[in-house]
Structure formats: structure tokens, C-alpha cells
A protein has these predicted regions:
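Periplasmic-binding protein-like
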Residues: 12-15, 106-137, 139-160
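Short loop->beta-strand "edge-of-pocket" segments that line small-molecule binding or catalytic clefts
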Residues: 36-60
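N-terminal segment of the mature folded domain
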Residues: 1-33
């Protein structure tokens, strides 16, 4: 629930997921039975993960997935989704968590885990300022939407409040 005096403008969302090399036989059929296979994977000492840096939203997601498990590679942290995808593509790691667009850019397999939403909360007292009006207008401009879609962001069409 929002506090009084602010307004929510829905922004964009992007899908985060489990990434892996599609030609790695250890991940065959992985997308069909993720939960079951993920448990098996955590007990395989041969599989190396690449983690995200502490404090990132992706790290929060990973820590929630892993619980108390610390698989091989847990201590190796990457600072971006691109770095995670590069590590997996170059076989420095077998799996990680990243956004769909970077997995596709590297030709990696992707199993969706959850969407992240990016919204804007603006004080009502600033709604009429030219910069705020410009931002609100940009949210629905077709060229902006198309460019952001190329980067893996989808316009969040939920209700503004």
C-alpha cells in the first residue's frame, strides 16, 4: 500500500531465470521438471554455479532458491547479468541466474524463475513538473518501448495508482 501523497506509475518488468549451456547433457529436460531436477543438481559436486554479488536483487532470489545449500562456485560472484552469462557460455561455470535477454544473446538455455518489476513512485506535489511529465510521457512512447524490449524489458501494463 502506498503512503498518502504519492502516485504509482507502472514501469517495466523483466524475466529472471536459471541459465545453462543447452548442449550440456546434464541439463537435458531440465525445463520440464525444474524443481525436481534443481534438487538433484544441488547435490552434484561436479556442477559449478556462478553467483551474483551480495546486495543485488538477483542474489536475493538465488539465496532464496538455495536455502542453506552452497554448491560448487557459490563464492564466485559476478557483478552483472552479462558476466554471469559469459561465465556460463565460456564454461567457467555450468549454471547461474540472469535475465532472459543476456541468456539469449549468449545462446544459452533459460528456465524462467520470476519477473522483476520496475515502477515509479512520484510525490503528487511534483506531478506537474516538466521533467516528471516528460518521464511519464516516455513510458508509453513506442520507440522507447521497442528499445527496452530489445533489452529484455516489457512494459508493465498494470493499473497506475
Amino acid at each position: 500500500m502506498l503512503t498518502q501523497g504519492v502516485k504509482l506509475f507502472k514501469g517495466y518488468r523483466r524475466g529472471q531465470g536459471f541459465i545453462f549451456r543447452e548442449d550440456d547433457p546434464r541439463f537435458q529436460g531440465f525445463q520440464d521438471s525444474f524443481q525436481e531436477r534443481f534438487e538433484e543438481m544441488l547435490s552434484d559436486p561436479e556442477l559449478r554455479m556462478i553467483n551474483r554479488n551480495r546486495g543485488s536483487g538477483t542474489r536475493v532470489l538465488i539465496d532464496g532458491l538455495l536455502g542453506k545449500h552452497q554448491p560448487q562456485g557459490f563464492l564466485y560472484e559476478a557483478k552483472s547479468h552479462q558476466a554471469v552469462a559469459a561465465a556460463v557460455a565460456q564454461s567457467r561455470a555450468d549454471w547461474g541466474v540472469a535475465i532472459r535477454s543476456v541468456a539469449e544473446d549468449q545462446g544459452l538455455g533459460f528456465t524462467p524463475l520470476q519477473d522483476e518489476e520496475y515502477d515509479f513512485i512520484i510525490p503528487e506535489s511534483r506531478l506537474q513538473k516538466p521533467a516528471v511529465q516528460a518521464l511519464i510521457g516516455l513510458l508509453d512512447e513506442k520507440p522507447i518501448i521497442e528499445r527496452l524490449e530489445q533489452m529484455g524489458l516489457i512494459r508493465n501494463l498494470g493499473k497506475d495508482r
